[in-house]
């Protein structure tokens, strides 16, 4: 298990994405991935609509802009297949497995442990989710 990173939590707010942040997420995706791999608005919006609780963002407290995000879908399937990336209807809120679909950190926010902290926060949230179900 990771340790709580106080410095990162002072610099960034970790929370679930809001619907009004879809455009920001799509822009970050376009920066972090080549065009043939980047998730488009057409596929990102349904992910956020279907599983906002599985879309964690890190927001820079000074600029109030998204710096990074991690997202996934829940399922009872055991293997990640290509259709998860293009069909958010694969999400099953009662699913016992989480398929991680993207981890994006803007270049200017890299190399300070932000991706690791997103993964740790995501893991904690999903452990709580499991306990509630």
PLM regions: where:
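Short acidic N-proximal helix/loop "leader" segments that mark the beginning
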Residues: 1-7
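A short beta-loop-alpha structural element at the N-terminal edge
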Residues: 11-25
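Helix-loop element at the rim of GNAT/NAT acetyltransferase active sites that forms part
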Residues: 16, 27-40
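Hydrophobic adenine-recognition pocket in adenosine-nucleotide-binding enzymes
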Residues: 17, 103-105
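Active-site rim helix/loop that mediates acceptor-substrate recognition in acyltransferases
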Residues: 34-62, 71-80, 84-90
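Conserved acyl-donor/pantetheine-binding loop and adjacent beta-alpha core of acyl/acetyltransferases
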Residues: 65, 69-103, 110, 120
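Conserved GNAT acetyl-CoA-binding A-motif
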Residues: 98, 119, 126-133
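Conserved G/P- and acidic residue-centered "switch" motifs that form tight phosphate/ATP-binding loops
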Residues: 113
């Amino acid at each position: 298990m990771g340790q709580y990173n106080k410095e990162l939590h002072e610099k960034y707010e970790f929370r679930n994405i809001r619907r009004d942040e879809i455009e920001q997420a799509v822009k970050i995706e376009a920066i972090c991935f080549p065009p043939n791999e980047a998730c488009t608005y057409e596929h990102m919006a349904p992910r956020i609509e279907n599983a906002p609780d599985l879309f964690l963002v890190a927001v820079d407290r000074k600029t109030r802009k998204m710096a990074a995000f991690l997202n996934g879908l829940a399922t009872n399937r055991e293997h990640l297949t290509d259709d998860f990336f293009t069909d958010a209807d694969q999400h099953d809120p009662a699913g016992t497995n989480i398929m991680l679909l993207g981890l994006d950190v803007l270049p200017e926010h890299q190399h300070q442990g932000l991706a690791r902290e997103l993964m740790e926060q995501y893991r904690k949230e999903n452990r709580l989710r499991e306990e509630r179900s």
